[in-house]
Amino acid sequence: MALKPLHDRVLVRRTESEEKTAGGLIIPDSAKEKPSEGVVVACGEGARKDSGELIAMAVKEGDNILFGKWSGTEVTVDGEELLMMKESDIMGVIV
């Protein structure tokens, strides 16, 4: 199943978090926080103004992004857990 976001929504794949701390301690799965970094998998066309004019998206597929801890809605696509969020939930692009 392919999923294309609508309007100003973005589909994001979370990046994997570190398995160890800087001191070498292994972090168990139960103690790991979900990462707030990810890669844009797909984007909608963008939002529209009241006049109907399209507002272009600031992110594109493949961008590494930073988003809020509680951003987005978890969705499962082809057995993979992804996040669907509005572009405004994205804090920035990692360059």
Curated annotation (Swiss-Prot):
Matches recorded under Pfam families: Cpn10
GO process terms (BP): chaperone cofactor-dependent protein refolding
Gene Ontology terms, MF aspect: ATP binding; metal ion binding; protein folding chaperone; protein-folding chaperone binding; unfolded protein binding
Subcellular location: Cytoplasm
This protein's UniProt keywords: Chaperone, Cytoplasm
SUPFAM superfamilies linked to this entry: GroES-like
Any GO CC annotation of this UniProt entry: cytoplasm
Principal cellular location given in the protein's record: cytoplasm
Family membership noted in the UniProt record: Belongs to the GroES chaperonin family.
Quaternary structure and interacting proteins, as annotated: Heptamer of 7 subunits arranged in a ring. Interacts with the chaperonin GroEL.
Function, in words: Together with the chaperonin GroEL, plays an essential role in assisting protein folding. The GroEL-GroES system forms a nano-cage that allows encapsulation of the non-native substrate proteins and provides a physical environment optimized to promote and accelerate protein folding. GroES binds to the apical surface of the GroEL ring, thereby capping the opening of the GroEL channel.
Alphabetized PANTHER family for the sequence: 10 KDA HEAT SHOCK PROTEIN (PTHR10772), CO-CHAPERONIN GROES (PTHR10772:SF58)
Protein name: Co-chaperonin GroES
Name of the gene this protein is made from: groES
